[in-house]
Amino acid sequence: MSEALALGFSEEKRSDVGIAATEAATNIFLHGRGGELLICPSKAGEDVCLDLMALDSGPGISDITRAMQDGFSTIGTAGQGLGAIGRLADDSSIFSAPDKGTVYWCRFLSSGSRERFRTGIINLAIKEETVSGDSYLIVRHEARTVFMVVDGLGHGAGATEAAQEAVKTVERYANRSSAEIIEHTHDELKKTRGAAMSLAIVDHNQKTLTYAGIGNVTGMIVAPGASKSLITQNGTLGAALPRSPQEFVQAIAPSSTLIMFSDGLNSRVGLTAYPGLINRPAPLIAGVLYRDFSRRRDDATILVAPLEGNA
């Protein structure tokens, strides 16, 4: 698998990824009434991982324990089922509900540890393009972590150029305030077609989150029984910046999760229709939300990060 090779995976791990992808795709075909298999590489600092997500909108799995036993998902094939995938992968989980389909996720690590890869990220180009005009960044700088999602205007190479320029600028100024980061990014994007971008900065000592955004990259903080939308300002980085970029600071409540997404997902994103999903791994949350809220007509990025442990 080319993605695993590009990430520097060993030959053995590349083989494991290939087996897992085949098993997951077969499971969708046999039981999911069609669906998608997403291959999502992610990066945090020098560490990288590869997520496989099998998404379907089929009848759901009534007995998840049985489904995870060897052979259940691929009876009649040469495969060994979801249980075998779970043993090959470094981490895995499943979410299923009656008449709402199933999302199965597994993760393969190149380096680092599971704790450093608690975030779930999906970043996909529109089908007609080979590159995404969206991007993201996660950077840890001393006592804080910066999460960023950017959406270059339009799609294709021009949008990608704007998004990657934003990534480089945010990484360069990651130790500054969110307002300063936005101002620097605006200046650097003047040579591009522009972008929308939102930042969330977690202060690990103060246990606070500072949020700032320009344009239509949406952010929210969810917790069991609660959800709060994060405020962004109108404008376009590189073209039209508000005179004073605003920062919004709030304390991080227990069991909170940050969700950020581009307008490739519709604005109705939420977890209320999925009992128990808030307590599942972040990549699984990202997979469910992408499946059910992606517009499928634009580049799409969603970042899900549990804040307990990151703060």
Predicted feature descriptions by range:
Residues 1-22:
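Conserved short strand/loop->alpha-helix "switch" segment adjacent to the catalytic nucleotide/phosphoryl-transfer site
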Residues 12, 25-115, 141-148, 202-204, ...:
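Conserved beta-strand-loop-beta-strand hairpin that lines the nucleotide-binding pocket
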Residues 80, 93-97, 112-158, 163-311:
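Conserved subregion of the PPM/PP2C metallophosphatase catalytic domain
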